[in-house]
């Protein structure tokens, strides 16, 4: 049996744009993609801290400092909103006990301020 666990999270990134006319996705700063370990076209869930919206899309490379929601997802955000961007992975129960997701914290300019592995002490 597999279980779905958090793989990586970018915590409280600032939305820099919303482009309704783009075909879809979230454009993410290359530095944040690298720090978090996200992959191009990887599915992500996005949680808007300002309005409570929760939705899924996929990752594309953006410009430095950019977090831009594109296509239909643009309806769920406004410039300046804070969002949490998460990806998940399917693991066996044994793998889940050892798994430590990556969490990336950013400032208001979407620059990495801290990167850490989440503690797995409760997964015994």
From Swiss-Prot:
What broad class describes the main subcellular location of this protein? cytoplasm
Listed cofactors: pyruvate
Q: Name one GO molecular function term.
A: aspartate 1-decarboxylase activity
Q: How is the cofactor bound?
A: Binds 1 pyruvoyl group covalently per subunit.
GO terms for CC? cytosol
Residues annotated as the enzyme's active site: 25 (schiff-base intermediate with substrate), 58 (proton donor)
Q: What's the EC number here? A: 4.1.1.11
Known role: Catalyzes the pyruvoyl-dependent decarboxylation of aspartate to produce beta-alanine.
Q: What is this protein called?
A: Aspartate 1-decarboxylase
Q: Which organism is it from?
A: Bdellovibrio bacteriovorus (strain ATCC 15356 / DSM 50701 / NCIMB 9529 / HD100)
Classification lineage: Bacteria, Pseudomonadati, Bdellovibrionota, Bdellovibrionia, Bdellovibrionales
Designated gene of the protein: panD
